[in-house]
């Protein structure tokens, strides 16, 4: 099964991907992770990416696509994969389709997880991390025993810059601008499966499984 997970920051893609990995025994492919790995291993595409990164430039789509292609050619992807955070744009989706076609493969399902903006803000702005040991908490869903104090080391709990409302609203705006065309793209291809991400982890997982088996 070849699967793409789409959804805004905070919707729960990472959590759901882990459950799907365990169920189907296929790897999760995150572009950030494979980019770092390719650069570290100095694969042909990793070497190209390193040149851009060392100069402070954005890695162009054709190099990112090349790194994705290198990863998809590996043995553990032969029975399927879960793409998380890629593609982000219609040109990337077109390029991915061409790469997969050359391998005799295609995307089976694109699961689009959605949650309303207020819920996403609650999930993301409530995150806290220990400034000392890095332990994670949430003011609503996983609070520390003493407000603002780490259970593990008594360090101070802080809100990261990435979890502040202004930053999150900007990330959501960028996501919406990039991804709305992608949703239409995969809907037209007949592979889009829309799933409500509001619910327990188990309930959302059940809805995903039902959607891809329908």
UniProtKB/Swiss-Prot annotation:
Pathway: Purine metabolism; AMP biosynthesis via salvage pathway; AMP from ADP: step 1/1. It holds the Pfam family ADK_lid. Belongs to the adenylate kinase family. Monomer. Residues 126-163 are annotated as: LID. This is Adenylate kinase. ATP binds at residues 10-15, 127, 199. Gene3D superfamilies: P-loop containing nucleotide triphosphate hydrolases. Its EC number is 2.7.4.3. It is found in: Cytoplasm. Residues 30-59 are annotated as: NMP. The gene is adk. Consists of three domains, a large central CORE domain and two small peripheral domains, NMPbind and LID, which undergo movements during catalysis. The LID domain closes over the site of phosphoryl transfer upon ATP binding. Assembling and dissambling the active center during each catalytic cycle provides an effective means to prevent ATP hydrolysis. Some bacteria have evolved a zinc-coordinating structure that stabilizes the LID domain. Keywords: ATP-binding, Cytoplasm, Kinase, Metal-binding, Nucleotide biosynthesis, Nucleotide-binding, Transferase, Zinc. NCBIfam families: adk, PRK00279.1-2, PRK00279.1-3, PRK14527.1. It comes from the Bacteria. Disulfide bonds: none annotated. One of its GO terms (cellular component) is cytoplasm. GO terms for biological process: AMP salvage.
